Amino acid sequence: FSGHAANWKGYLKGIEAGDKYALELWNTIQNDAHYKGKTTLFITSDHGRHLDGVKNGYINHGCDCEGCRHINLLALGPDFKQNKIFTHQRNQKDIASTIAYMLSFQMATSKGEVMMEMFK
């Protein structure tokens, strides 16, 4: 919510809190014998943010600007390469196709591509 409130300091604190929650979740998974080494975690967002100079900047989103069209993805799990950052562009539909691939089901009408570069 801090992003929409035009509170940059709060926005950064929100990102920091989200990072801590993600780490806590991953550590919980890794400390559970049932899930450790067998669980995949995808963390992403449903949209990006305006870049500086576009409309009202980071406090909003929703157009087709460069910032709104890009999201981050953190993918953790035993099937993925570790400590790698992939910088080529992907689309949200590629996330769905990758998850479908991992679960061994077809998405016949999907236009997404499996993100094979992430796999070991």
Region spans (language model):
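Anion-binding catalytic surfaces of enzymes that hydrolyze or transfer phosphate/sulfate esters
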Residues: 1-18
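Short acidic, glycine/proline-rich loop/turn micro-motifs
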Residues: 3-8, 54-56, 84
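A structural signal for well-ordered alpha-helical segments within the folded catalytic domains
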Residues: 16-23, 90-97, 113
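Metal-dependent active-site segment of extracytoplasmic phospho-/sulfohydrolases and closely related
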Residues: 17, 21-59, 99
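Histidine-centered active-site/metal-ligand motif
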Residues: 1-5, 47, 60-61, 66
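Solvent-exposed loop/turn segments at secondary-structure junctions
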Residues: 1-2, 46-51, 78-81
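Substrate-binding rim/cap in mid-to-C-terminal beta-strand-loop elements of soluble/periplasmic
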Residues: 60-103
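Polar, surface-exposed loop/tail segments
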Residues: 90, 104-120
